[in-house]
Amino acid sequence: MAFFHDHRLHPDDPRREGVLNRYSENLKDTFDALTESNVPVLVGSVVVNERDCPPLGSLHPFGMSDDARSDFDAIWNQALNAEARDDLISAINFLKKAMEIDARFAKLHFRLARLYERTEDLTSSRFHYRQAKDCDALPFRASSAINVTLKQAVESVASTSIHFVDLESYLRNHPSSMNQVPGGAFFYEHVHFRFNGDYTMASYLFPHIQQILNLPRMEPGEESVRLLELVDCAKELGYNPVLEAMMIQSMIQLQKGPPF
């Protein structure tokens, strides 16, 4: 992790495009091999914590002048001061002014998302949460481009055995996602699911698995009866408060080191 912290990538770094291209090629090769072996496949979009995980890295563009950096920092501090005195509109306006200097600075978008959320402009808030993720200079969270590439790879394969499941859209529209932004209700930190997150994903995938394997199914309206409730599922798996505390402790230890 410390290595990555010293090798951050600006969101417009051309190497990112190279990674996406190789990712797409690898996906298609994998799908071809699975299709030849008659293996049914479910491919889910990648879900990450947008709301409750600030960007792990923010970078100004290479070659940004010292004057521009100085102007950006001055406006940034004005925004922080405005927010500190609860002048949210002024804070937003200062940050929008800073965006005119650098519109790809990740933590600027995250702060804007929080401010817009507090002023109940939820459309703008959602936009900037996503921008904060996509501009993260330490992209441990899957970007929007990753999921677009994933879906396009599935659509490019001429096979009825490869199925795409839009887990991201499902989680965005889940009642536990505040303002349609996945967050701490499902994740410990940037990507690792809480038990509730695992349960939510598994419950949504269940009927898709039945379908792709041609398993017998009840009527759609009755299908949910077969699913255990969260508490009962935890009991069957032996997941208890002690294990939950151990998970939380391990996540606390994880976040004491880089890149956090």
Indicate where each model-derived feature is located.
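Pore domain of cation channels
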Residues: 187-190
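Accessory beta->alpha helical hairpin/"wing" motif in late/C-terminal subdomains of nucleic-acid enzymes
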Residues: 193-196
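Hydrophobic/aromatic beta-strand patches that form the interior of the parallel beta-sheet core
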Residues: 42-44, 160-165
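Helix C-cap/helix->beta junction micro-motif
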Residues: 37, 157-160
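Serine-dependent acyl-ester chemistry module
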Residues: 1-152, 170-177, 182-184, 207, ...
